[in-house]
Amino acid sequence: MNYEQIRFSRPDGLVRKKPFQKVTIRQAVTVFLIQILLFFTVESLAQIYLGNGGLAITEAIVLAVAVIPVWILHADPREVFLVRRPNRWATGGALVFLIGAYSLSVIANSLMMMLFPKEFAQIYESTEAASSTFPVDLVVVCLMPAVCEEALHRGLIQSAVRERVHHLVGQSIIMGVFFAFFHVYPIRYPAMFVMGAALSYVYGLTGNLFYSSLMHFSCNLFATLLGYLGQGALTAAAVVPLPGGIRLTVSPEEVSAAMSAGSFGLILLIYGIPAVFFLYLGEYLIRRGTDAVRPYFVPRDRRRQKSVLWNRIYSPIIAIAAVGVLFLVIGIAFGI
């Protein structure tokens, strides 16, 4: 083939596609602020007047807020919304990791319940959900947030954060802050920070939205089941990662009576110490399913083994036990 043969031909096969752009942190923050603005206007009104239908509209808007900017900014959706075939080891590891994160969320809510009983009770009165059926809640409260909110947070926002922050712990902390502010109410910030950081950490380990979505769905499902089984599970029902949809209404006196300093110390010991093991085991199983080289449960190198065990197991357990016993002693000694 020479020049004369292609001189007047149409260069269809030679046209270069416009290169994909990376989503910047500034753009991600702008999108996030737009979502918050929509929550205080369209989404909140939809929830007030339409109940669970409003929640469905809210989640649909969240998904649109995640997807539309990717199209406008000409970002690669395959890099922003990473979904791959799941691995059985990593799937089990994600669920084990969730148990640890959920336990820490219970501790965070218990702390807020002890420190701010009045505000804690008011937030649950203001967000009490309308009556619904379990199949509807399964879709609206459990499934839709697991897809829509993960697309926004672990998809759009974390794809921007990881371009500037390469350390996974740093990414998780930043994403925890985003997830906390997403849920609007300050009294819920600590628990939502923990859950957001945990979801982002697992997503950073796997590069697969399936696992964080599975964790999100499982967390909402567990809290929803507790809501149907009984109204007394204060700390567990409090960790529903959803802007609205809370089923529990309690008085400040009931909250205060339920969470004394001694009770908090006991919860810290009961939930905190096992959480350390669940988080470590969950991460190991995730790495076993996703890493190219199968990891050891404990490093074989003596120096590294000592460092890992001390930093990941011994130190957290000692700190949790010390603080838990301190609150127990305060509660017993002073009756608070």
What is each of the regions a protein language model found here?
Residues 35-49, 168, 327-331:
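Membrane-embedded alpha-helical segments in integral membrane proteins
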Residues 49-57, 125-130, 257-266:
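Interfacial loop-to-helix junctions that mark the boundaries of transmembrane helices
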Residues 135-335:
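Transmembrane helix-loop-helix hairpins at the membrane interface
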Residues 28, 32-36, 40, 59-64, ...:
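Alpha-helical transmembrane spans of integral membrane proteins, capturing the lipid-embedded, hydrophobic core
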Residues 2-15, 51-99, 110-117, 276-302:
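Membrane-helix interface linkers and caps
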Residues 39, 43, 66-73, 179-183, ...:
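Structural signal for membrane-spanning alpha-helices in multi-pass inner-membrane proteins
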Residues 7-8, 46-50, 78-148, 159, ...:
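Juxtamembrane helix-loop-helix connectors linking adjacent transmembrane helices
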Residues 5-37, 77-106, 133, 261-265, ...:
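Interfacial transmembrane-helix boundary/kink motif in multi-pass membrane proteins
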